[in-house]
Design a protein with these regions (language model features):
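Compositionally biased terminal segments of proteins
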Residues: 1-195
Length: 195
């Protein structure tokens, strides 16, 4: 699938700003396509620029120049690559690997908002709620190894979420509470200093 088809067959607008975003494509016109396609990349290690390097922009179509990717550091890129599973021939991220991405997004958006950046509070809340929606799908025996960096991010998320209100009932989650769910995450990811 090329950029022209992605633009034609998927929505490319950012919900909060209304601007086109060319790293996430949602709401396909055809039910044969996945609900969402996101483009990820890692920081290329083969491009090393000198401090005094001069970059020259290439003249290309305006919309094509907007094609972008969510840039991941090496630890998250490895989790993305190693955590894939195939569903109907489409690579998707496994449940236990998706949760740390949602937790990291929550941490990053929350920090950006605290630093005065324009961040939609609904997006922050969505990522927090997504963590709990996904957590209800894991079992007490589910385990996922994490790199030290991602494990630290998960610990930070779990520590900060302790002070947050999470309305499990409105998320359709019953028969448990936030404390039990966070304990399950500590277990799942082998985060030893469980409070």
């Amino acid at each position: 699938m090329d950029l022209q088809n992605l633009r034609k067959d998927f929505k490319v607008l950012n919900k909060s700003t209304g601007n086109a975003q060319f790293y996430r494509f949602t709401s396909p016109k055809s039910k044969e396509y996945p609900y969402m396609i996101e483009i990820f990349s890692r920081n290329p290690d083969f491009i090393i620029l000198e401090d005094d390097a001069v970059l020259t922009p290439l003249p290309i179509d305006d919309e094509i120049s907007s094609l972008s990717a969510i840039l991941l550091n090496e630890a998250y890129y490895e989790l993305l690559k190693n955590g894939q599973m195939m569903v109907d021939g489409i690579p998707v991220l496994s449940l236990t690997c998706l949760i740390p991405f949602k937790a990291k997004a929550w941490l990053d958006l929350k920090e950006r908002k605290l630093n005065g950046e324009q961040v939609d509070s609904k997006n922050i809340k969505k990522h927090k709620n997504d963590v709990f929606r996904l957590t209800q799908l894991i079992t007490a025996n589910t385990r996922q190894a994490l790199s030290p960096e991602i494990a630290e991010d998960m610990k930070k998320f779990l520590s900060e979420i302790a002070d947050e209100t999470v309305d499990l009932k409105s998320l359709g989650i019953r028969g448990t509470d936030k404390k039990k769910m966070t304990e399950m995450l500590y277990q799942c990811y082998g985060l030893k200093d469980n409070p």
